[in-house]
């Protein structure tokens, strides 16, 4: 049974998600559709890349991942399909797929009757349905080697500490960094934008209510939260804030 995941910035107050799903369901009988999220902030390609990067490998090989965060829709930016790690991807050529390791890309032709403001429905969804139905990548377009590459920032060592930054803020106000948990020695204190958070704990539940706590989150990197509160709001920081271990 084919699986297609969906990640967009369309939100849920309009008909956009349903219109995309209508294409997928009508062209791929028996498909399972999985919503990763439709609540990416409008046009936030970096957030879309982060969420897709941490979720795609949870699915079985052969899954098709349809990702549409596309502030350049209708312009000269290309539409892409790709394969990597036994999975298939469909997305705009704006860096959304920069996390892939050794991908193969093709450029998908845009039909003349595609709505210039809704390639998610008229270009990307048909391509995802074709792949989920067994079409080969090369059947969808011409191979390219110059896809836009804008990877997420990586941490570095400055000689005394691991220096990273906040990659994403979740709906709880948790600050999710790019520092891998194994890079932090036991007892090392975590600082966010100059504020001392303390050493890593096992989980946010180990902290007192209303206090900051650092831990290794389910994505494998250092996170900073407030138990029963919002670290982003308490500290007044967001994506890009410095994290030091």
Regions found by a protein language model. Give the residues of each.
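Conserved active-site and cofactor/substrate-binding residues in soluble primary-metabolism enzymes
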Residues: 15, 19, 28, 43, ...
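Surface-exposed interaction regions enriched in Ser/Thr/Asp/Glu
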Residues: 239-245
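Fold-independent oxyanion-binding glycine-rich loops
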Residues: 8-10, 36-38, 68-71, 84-85, ...
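A conserved acidic, glycine/proline-rich C-terminal tail/linker
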Residues: 176-236
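Active-site histidine-anchored catalytic micro-motif
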Residues: 3, 27-30, 47, 60-69, ...
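Structural motif
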Residues: 3-5, 31-34, 63-66, 79-81, ...
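N-terminal glycine-/serine-/threonine-rich phosphate-binding loop
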Residues: 1-76
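Anionic-ligand-binding alpha/beta catalytic cores of soluble enzymes and soluble regulatory domains
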Residues: 114-179, 183-184
